[in-house]
């Protein structure tokens, strides 16, 4: 049975559970559940602190896990990213009082507070900057006001917390993070679990594609078909079927959801009609 770690709380937990549900896996009904078994898919899910997941996976006790890229890197665990999932996106940055610093070189000899000591220490060392790093478990925005540090390094999603604390970001981003699937770096493919791992990844990839694309159907005249197909090439090639009325064809193709409205406008302009889009709930490419 495949053993998978899932975040039990925080910004990773809800979207991870939703994606797994869309991928056809049973999920917990109550937040207090720490372990459930999905007998149909032969998967056992363990709900763990997001910060601990990389450690469990690197130990080999669990086959794969879902966590944040920032948490994976900060842990220093012997685990690697195998699939980005596109949610819980954030940027890790330095911040301070306005005018306190403009770049990383200004941090020499100063104190930086962060909940991600591993990421910050490695980033500073890679750039030859000698600064003190103070580890705090949370609410690092108050570290400057209380005199614990002169600068902080933290995850920035909207920047609201920083602005409320009178802080502003500076310098280049330290890293960009999102939810990722991880596995042990030196994991040897096992004939029992590896097919399940690959099936799991295919399912999640199918969810990602289904969220990104819509199915578009429309009718157009044969003489406008090439122009229409140029607008809707599909992933491989669109499906084209003759209609009962001579000189007309029906076309079906997957198109990027973000571009659907523009494509519909362009199709209408060249004479296509009965244009509609349908949500894709699951797919395999």
Curated annotation (Swiss-Prot):
Keyword Amino-acid biosynthesis found: yes
CDD domains the UniProt entry points to: PBP2_HisGL1
UniProt subcellular location: Cytoplasm
Xref: Pfam families: HisG, HisG_C
Keywords: Amino-acid biosynthesis, ATP-binding, Cytoplasm, Glycosyltransferase, Histidine biosynthesis, Magnesium, Metal-binding, Nucleotide-binding, Transferase
GO cellular component, one term: cytoplasm
Pathway, per record: Amino-acid biosynthesis; L-histidine biosynthesis; L-histidine from 5-phospho-alpha-D-ribose 1-diphosphate: step 1/9
GO BP annotation list: L-histidine biosynthetic process
One Gene Ontology term of the molecular function aspect: ATP binding
Residues that span the membrane, as ranges: none
Protein task: Catalyzes the condensation of ATP and 5-phosphoribose 1-diphosphate to form N'-(5'-phosphoribosyl)-ATP (PR-ATP). Has a crucial role in the pathway because the rate of histidine biosynthesis seems to be controlled primarily by regulation of HisG enzymatic activity.
Family statement: Belongs to the ATP phosphoribosyltransferase family. Long subfamily.
NCBIfam families for the chain: hisG, HisG_C-term
Name this protein carries in UniProt: ATP phosphoribosyltransferase
Native source species: Streptomyces coelicolor (strain ATCC BAA-471 / A3(2) / M145)
Taxon lineage: Bacteria, Bacillati, Actinomycetota, Actinomycetes, Kitasatosporales
Gene: hisG
């Amino acid at each position: 049975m495949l053993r998978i770690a899932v975040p039990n709380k925080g910004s990773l937990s809800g979207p991870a559970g939703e994606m797994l549900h869309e991928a056809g896996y049973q999920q917990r009904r109550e937040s207090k559940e720490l372990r459930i078994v999905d007998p149909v898919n032969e998967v056992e899910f363990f709900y763990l602190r997001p910060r601990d997941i990389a450690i469990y996976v690197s130990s080999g006790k669990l086959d794969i896990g879902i966590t944040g890229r920032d948490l994976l890197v900060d842990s220093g665990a012997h685990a690697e990213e195998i699939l980005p999932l596109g949610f819980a996106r954030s940027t890790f940055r330095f911040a301070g009082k306005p005018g306190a610093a403009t770049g990383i070189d200004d941090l020499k000899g100063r104190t930086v507070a962060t909940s991600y000591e591993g990421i910050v220490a490695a980033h500073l060392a890679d750039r030859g900057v000698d600064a003190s790093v103070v580890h705090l478990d949370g609410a690092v925005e108050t570290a400057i006001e209380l005199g614990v540090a002169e600068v902080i390094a933290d995850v920035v999603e909207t920047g609201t917390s920083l602005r409320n604390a009178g802080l502003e970001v500076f310098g280049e981003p330290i890293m960009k993070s999102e939810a990722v699937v991880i596995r042990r770096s030196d994991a040897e493919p096992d004939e029992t679990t590896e097919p399940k791992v690959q099936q799991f990844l295919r399912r999640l990839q199918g969810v990602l594609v289904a969220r990104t694309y819509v199915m578009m159907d429309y009718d157009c005249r044969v003489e406008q078909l090439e122009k229409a197909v140029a607008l809707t090439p599909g992933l491989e090639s669109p499906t084209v079927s003759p209609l009962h009325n001579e000189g007309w064809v029906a076309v079906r193709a997957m198109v990027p959801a973000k571009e659907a409205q523009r494509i519909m406008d362009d199709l209408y302009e060249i004479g296509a009609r009965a244009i509609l889009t349908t949500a894709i709930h699951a797919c395999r490419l």
